[in-house]
């Protein structure tokens, strides 16, 4: 398993009470000495001051636990300041920037130099939604893009499977640790993604303790789907109020992950696109969110069955969104 001393330092610092992503981003660039980190922590934490010895003890404890827990299922972990830690796209506030990732597969697929297209949607697509989504994914892969999505059933799985069928690369972002792939029924797809040169990535090294925590993790996963892509594409999704708009859906709890991811993309100034054909989808509730986004944003790209090639080229030729740049000390990854 590959990791740097810097990654262990970031993980250890984050374990202190009151220390979150925003604090890490504001105070650490990566590769600081333990003396410096402890000094900064003691200016912030409200508990008893920590010490270099205590920090070192916590750090080695984390290291032994991670090796024991993930040696068989994780290729490594990277943190802010590491040479292979992926930079986010777009304008992301400090509290929402990732600082630490566990991975299995090729972490460089999230590189700022890579062209990444996120394709997402609902859990239960019907009719010709799958066929149309596959054609879009196929075209992007054909033009050299890497596909990014969650690992949920439905549109997420379709995007990964088509990327693999098209001999392309794909990245699955998880809400769970790598030793507990979720959903469990998609473990086979997860293994296939890695075997065929793709990537599994997660911010989590522990299992969730409650349904509320799991819900929060799905939201955090949705933000990563947005900030690690150059454009995000919505295949199909219900809107937040779909159950109220359609009598046959009254009382149903409809999935909202795609809605959240598209919202994060808007906030981060990541280009957005939707799959939508007015003549086919006008009365289909599974395209409620697509219609809503089209009404809200005049600049959104609309992909139909007839313009896939044209819109693919347009999306890939867009100027990149604002991307952060930083100079990292080239710490050595070690086994």
Model-derived segments and their meaning:
Residues 1-7, 80-335:
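Glycine-biased, small-residue-rich flexible motifs in mid-sequence functional cores and linkers
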Residues 1-82:
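Short, small/acidic-rich helices and loops at N termini and domain boundaries
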């Amino acid at each position: 398993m590959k990791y740097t001393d810097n990654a262990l330092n970031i993980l250890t610092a984050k374990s202190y009470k009151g220390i979150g992503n925003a604090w890490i981003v504001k105070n650490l660039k990566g590769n600081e000495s333990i003396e410096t980190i402890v000094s900064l922590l003691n200016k912030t934490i409200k508990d008893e001051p920590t010490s270099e010895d205590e920090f070192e003890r916590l750090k080695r404890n984390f290291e032994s636990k991670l090796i024991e827990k993930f040696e068989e299922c994780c290729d490594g972990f990277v943190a802010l300041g590491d040479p292979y830690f992926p930079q986010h796209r777009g304008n992301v506030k400090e509290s929402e920037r990732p600082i630490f990732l566990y991975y299995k597969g090729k972490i460089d697929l999230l590189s700022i130099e890579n062209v990444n297209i996120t394709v997402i949607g609902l859990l239960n697509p019907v009719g010709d939604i799958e066929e149309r989504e596959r054609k879009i994914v196929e075209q992007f892969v054909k033009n050299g893009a890497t596909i990014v999505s969650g690992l949920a059933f439905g549109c997420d799985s379709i995007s990964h499977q088509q990327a693999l069928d098209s001999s392309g690369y794909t990245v699955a972002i998880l809400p769970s640790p790598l030793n507990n792939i979720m959903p469990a029924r998609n473990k086979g797809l997860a293994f296939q993604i890695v075997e065929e040169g793709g990537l599994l990535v997660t911010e989590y090294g522990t299992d969730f303790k409650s349904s509320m925590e799991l819900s929060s993790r799905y939201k955090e996963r949705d933000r990563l789907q947005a900030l690690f892509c150059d454009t995000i594409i919505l295949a199909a999704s219900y809107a937040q109020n779909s159950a109220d708009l359609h009598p046959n859906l009254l009382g149903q709890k409809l999935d909202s992950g795609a809605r959240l991811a598209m919202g994060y993309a808007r906030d981060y100034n990541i280009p957005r696109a939707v799959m939508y054909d007015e003549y086919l989808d006008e009365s289909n509730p599974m395209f409620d969110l697509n219609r809503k986004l089209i009404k809200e944003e005049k600049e959104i790209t609309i992909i139909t069955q007839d313009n896939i090639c044209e819109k693919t080229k347009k999306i890939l030729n867009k100027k990149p969104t604002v991307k952060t740049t930083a100079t990292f000390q080239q710490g050595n990854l070690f086994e």
